[in-house]
Amino acid sequence: MGLQLPASVVQEVRVFAQGHPCFADREPGRGFRLPAREAAQAALGKTILVAQYFNTESQCEAIRRLSCDPVLMWVAGRYLESTPTFVGANLWWTFPVDALESDRDRHAHLFHRDVDDFRFFKFFFYLTDVQPGDGAHVCVAGSHQRPPMLRPGDRWNIRRYSDDEVKRCFATERIMEICGPAGTGFAENTLCVHKGRTPTREPRLLLQLQYALFDYGVMHDRHPVSSLRMLA
C-alpha cells in the first residue's frame, strides 16, 4: 500500500489504452477498440467482462520504464531476498457487465490464490479511479501463510473459494478492499487469498507488474502481431 504513480504516467498509459486494441477474454483473436465494445459483444454473443492489451512493454514507453523502475526493483528485491527478475506486465480493463458466472471464474472474480512460481511478487496500479462498485481488488491479509482449510487436501489444492468460505475462515478486518484514485498502487504476494470484484458502476483499468527469481517466459503479455485479430 502507499504507492502512487505520477499523474503524467497515468495519463501516458491511458493514452496508450485509448489508442490500441484490447482483447476480450485475453484471447488474441478477439480484439476491439474501446468505442467498439458493444459491436465486439454482439460478435461474441455475450458480455465482455475482461479485455487485455498485448505487447505492452514494447509498445508503451511508460510501462517499459516502470518495469525497471529502481524503487519497484528495490521493493521486489527486499521481498524476494534476491535480485528480482521482471517477468511480465499485464494491462487490462474490467467492465461493469452482467457477466457469465463462467467468465467471473475464468477471470479470477472469485477468491483464489496464485501459484505462479515458488517465489514471486506483484505490483498493481489503478489507472482509473476505483471506489466501491468500480471493481476494487480484495485480499486477505496474512493468508499467503495460512490458506483456508475447509476440504480434504486444501493445504495443497489450488481452487476457487466462495465469499462465505472466506468469511468463515478469516476475521472481517483481515479482508481488505483496496480503493483509491487513479495512480494508486499496492504490492502483493498473490499467494494470498484475493480476487477482483466485478464492477457495478465504472470500468476499471489495472496494470500489473510481476517479478520473480527466474523468467520462464510464461507470465508476459507478448504475442506475435500476426496472431492478433479484430472482432470489431
Language model region names:
Residues 116-132, 179-180, 210-213:
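Short, conserved beta-strand element in jelly-roll/cupin
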Residues 132-193:
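Double-stranded beta-helix
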Residues 70-74, 121, 181:
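A structural signal for well-ordered alpha-helical segments within the folded catalytic domains
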Residues 145, 149-155, 185-187, 191-232:
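Non-heme Fe(II)/2-oxoglutarate
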Residues 93, 113, 125-129, 141:
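Short, structured patches in soluble enzyme cores that scaffold and shape functional sites
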